[in-house]
């Protein structure tokens, strides 16, 4: 396993990935989150997406063994146009994905609410290295999830500097 940044490790540990979980990762980037999540799956699966071709390529290279084993599918697509192949998800993971606090995202949140199982969750994590942005991130992302039918709570870590906005279904 390649080096996993502390912020990603903290977020994935917080999600408490179970071996049978079905997850969606939004914005897989270099694949660190996907690698760590897949290392915890047995019968579960991860569907990872990114709008960036380079992000998808990096994740595919980094996680080739998990793709071959059938635990990971990676696609270049935007959440707004996604048709999730998994009927039901236990968890949705996103790290530093600005969609949920910088623009209107009711359609995307509705899609997630439709796909996340009762008791499941949407886990939006952000580096909180810019403290002046954190209150706005929390307020806007929380509002997006609440308006979409999720029960929201916030978690905060000082080391690593991460804030999480968690929406439970």
State the predicted function of each range.
Residues 119-127:
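Conserved beta-strand signature within the Rossmann-like core of class I S-adenosyl-L-methionine
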Residues 80-92:
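A short acidic, Gly/Pro-enriched loop at the edge of an enzyme's catalytic core
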Residues 106-118:
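A short glycine-rich, Lys/Arg-flanked "PGG" loop and its adjoining helix->strand segment in the class I
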